[in-house]
Structures are given as C-alpha cells and as structure tokens.
Amino acid sequence: TFVVLTGVLGWIVSDPYALLFGLLLIRGLAGICNAPLHPGAAHVVSDTMSPSRRATANGMITAGALVGIACCYPGYGWLMDTLSWQWAFVVGGGALIAYGIIWKVLAADSLPHPQDITKTRPAHSERVSSLFRQSNLWAITLSYAMYSYFQYLIFYWMGFYFKEVLEVPDINARWAQFWIMIAMGAGMAIGGRSTDFACESLGRNRGRRVIAITGMGCGAVFGFAAVNVESFVAVTACLSASMAFTGMVEGVFWTTATDIGGRSRGLCGAFMNTGGNVGGLISPVLTPVIAEQLGWQGAIILACAISGVGSLIWLLINVPEPGEDQISA
C-alpha cells in the first residue's frame, strides 16, 4: 500500500518541499511496517528448523530479498522509461499487494511452539535486562553495523558511481547493478549452506567465525580491487565478487543473533538489525562527504576497511550451544 501511495503522491504534489515531507512520512510508515520482517523471519527459522539447517534457511530468505532488489534496477528502470516513476511505484506496489494476498491464502495460520519454552522461564523484564548485558549482543550488533556500512554504500551509490564517475550508459549501469545484486543473493544462499557445513566440520564457534571473517574479508579485498581496475567489465566483475563474498555472512549473522537471544531471539534480531540500519543510515550520508575529500575511490576503500575490521569482531563472539539459553538465568 505504501509503495502505491509513493507513486500517487507524485501525481498530487508538485512542490518539492511538500513532496519531500510526504515521502518521509510514507516511507517512514512503510519502515515501521517492514521492521519486523527480517527479525520475524529469523525467529520463525529458529522455531521451525533444526540447528544444523538454520543458517541455510536464513541464507535462502535473505537471498530472496536480493533477487527482488536486483530486479528493481532493470525492472523499475524500464517502467520509469516506459511509463513514469509514479506509475512504476503503483505497478510495483500493486504486485506486492497481490503477492501479500496469495501469501495470506496459502501460508499456515500458526506455527509450532518452539521447543525451548518451559514453564519455568524467567520474567520478560529479567530476560530483556539480561540480554542487554550480553557482550555477544553488542559485539554482533557492532559487526553488523560495520558490515551494513559497506553494503548500503553499494546499494545506494553504486548507480551513481557507474553513471557519473565511470560514465557508463544508464542501461548498462542498470544491468551491472542487477548482476552484482544477483551475485550477492547467490552468496547469501551459498554462505548459509556453507555456514552449516562449517559448523558441522569445525564446531559452531570456529565454523561461524571462518565464514564471517572469510566473507567480509574477501568482500573488502574485491571491493578494493574494483576501484583499482579500469574497464567496465572488470569493475562489474570485482564488485560482483565483492558482494558475493559479503553476502555469505548474512545467514550467519541472523542465525547467531537468534542463538544469542534464546527466548528473546526476536528482540535480539531486531536490536542487531537496528544497529545494521544505523550503519546503513550513516553510509549513504557520509559517503559523498568523504568522496569530496578523498575521491570516490577513497570513500569506497574506507568502507572496505570498515567491513574488514568488522569481520575481526567475530573473534569476540561466542555462539551458545543448541539448547543453551544465555539469558535464562
């Protein structure tokens, strides 16, 4: 509904300041409605999947989001070129409403009760207080914020970088963004399965650390390479590799957050996601400021460094074993 209203607003408002205020209001309300999506999905995975398959499931869910993001570049671009940006939002919102109706009809009405809920669980206020005393929560939130800083730079400034800095034609830039996002989605799916495999082979702590450090570290390396090559194809290939490796860690973040949270896994996932959104908010605003001082290469390299450092925080994160509730006491 809010997507449709975004397009409708463009028809009824012409003053730029009124349009800005309207967009802030509509998108803010959309954000409130969308906020439970990722934490809720991770909560459902934790309730319904065995521990050895949770990262795989979380990776597949987040990969689905990236497929949608990837299709926006050529899809919305074509709609805007063919119709208008207002109609693009109306059509996209209509498709989303139709899918929501189908989901409502086909999805199960309820979920099985999670296995770890007992009659002697502590009071809600005690669990929340104990959760926020966990160093694991703060460590994973900081790491996710640093990861999101790099990720959101690519989301919001990649088109500008291709079109204005590299002077790539619009249609080529859109398809480059499509393939880069598809690569990231593939990385999420592969990373989720790789996380479960690594945990089985190396143990939960070591396995997840290996995936997180490898994914964020290699993503930073290929991001650095992308700004040091010249051809359009080479830049696209390096950014695709960078985002594929970066995407590998999405499943391990969400799976670990719900493990840390225990009975408060929804809150833990939401808190981590808030930290990620803080990093994602700072990045699009700060990047052009940094680019004025260091150039776009410098701004991207700094984001790569932030993500790389964020990967090392995983050395401080200890994953609880299955059935162990860190905040039950």
Where are these regions (language model features)?
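Hydrophobic core of transmembrane alpha-helices in multi-pass small-molecule transporters
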Residues: 2-5, 18-36, 233-248
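Cytoplasmic helix-loop-helix junction between adjacent transmembrane helices
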Residues: 24-66
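Helix-loop-helix hairpin linking two adjacent transmembrane segments in secondary transporters
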Residues: 61-111
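Extracytoplasmic gate region of multi-pass secondary transporters
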Residues: 134-189, 247-250, 254, 258
